[in-house]
């Protein structure tokens, strides 16, 4: 998606909205098409497994290989570099010079003109990744009932970001996500959880929906994948 535009000497602006599932993206497409001088298309894309923020964000960076580290946070490593926060810009610049990462709130607070304005930002960079997080924050513990409102707020803010970029002369914009979400309006009951625990040589990371570890045992309650099956490097998983 990005490389063909860069190969034509174009610039590209990628908005990554955490947990923006397909149906919300489809609604955003409709909203954009209603705007004068705007065109929009939508394509489904399957997220990485396990489908969670750290791995999803890493997979959206250009890379030769992705792997889990051996620490208890199962930190995601892209081409030998920890893929968290500010390192993402370093990874981008290893592939495309004049690349920038920025949070959506920071972008929205910028003026249009001046050395620190959005026009200068667009002019000075070939690739900009904008990180946006409304839906995923609402979906965290004790805030599940706010997800519907968060989706509405997300669409409003994404439209604002797109307008902010286009007013600064940006033309090629991609809106994507690290993963989607499963909606529920109440907390999961204890009886709904599995009654068995994952076992193996070493459990590194134990989430509500998945387990990351080394030489995990086969169990009927779990679906087991190797790193190789998921397109990852290493022997963790």
What kind of region is each of these model predictions?
Residues 1-237:
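Feature captures the catalytic ectodomains and active-site-proximal regions of enzymes
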């Amino acid at each position: 998606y990005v490389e063909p535009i860069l190969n034509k000497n174009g610039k590209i602006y990628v908005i990554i909205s955490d947990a923006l599932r397909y149906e919300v993206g489809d609604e955003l497409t409709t909203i954009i098409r209603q705007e004068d001088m705007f065109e929009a298309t939508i394509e489904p894309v399957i997220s990485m497994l396990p489908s969670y923020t750290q791995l999803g964000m890493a997979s959206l960076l250009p890379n030769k290989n992705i792997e889990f580290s051996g620490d208890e946070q199962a930190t995601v490593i892209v081409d030998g570099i920890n893929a968290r926060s500010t390192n993402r810009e370093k990874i981008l610049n290893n592939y495309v010079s004049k690349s920038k990462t920025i949070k959506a709130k920071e972008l929205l607070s910028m003026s249009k003109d001046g050395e620190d304005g959005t026009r200068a930002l667009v002019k000075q960079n070939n690739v900009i990744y904008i990180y946006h997080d409304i839906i995923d924050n609402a979906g965290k513990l004790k805030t599940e009932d706010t997800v519907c409102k968060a989706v509405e707020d997300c669409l409003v803010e994404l439209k604002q970001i797109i307008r902010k970029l286009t007013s600064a002369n940006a033309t090629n914009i991609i809106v994507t996500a690290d993963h989607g979400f499963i909606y529920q309006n109440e907390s999961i009951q204890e009886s709904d959880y599995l009654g068995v625990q994952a076992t193996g040589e070493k459990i590194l990371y134990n989430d509500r929906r998945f387990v990351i570890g080394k030489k995990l045992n086969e169990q009927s309650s779990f679906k087991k994948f190797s790193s190789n099956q998921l397109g990852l490097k290493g022997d963790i998983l």
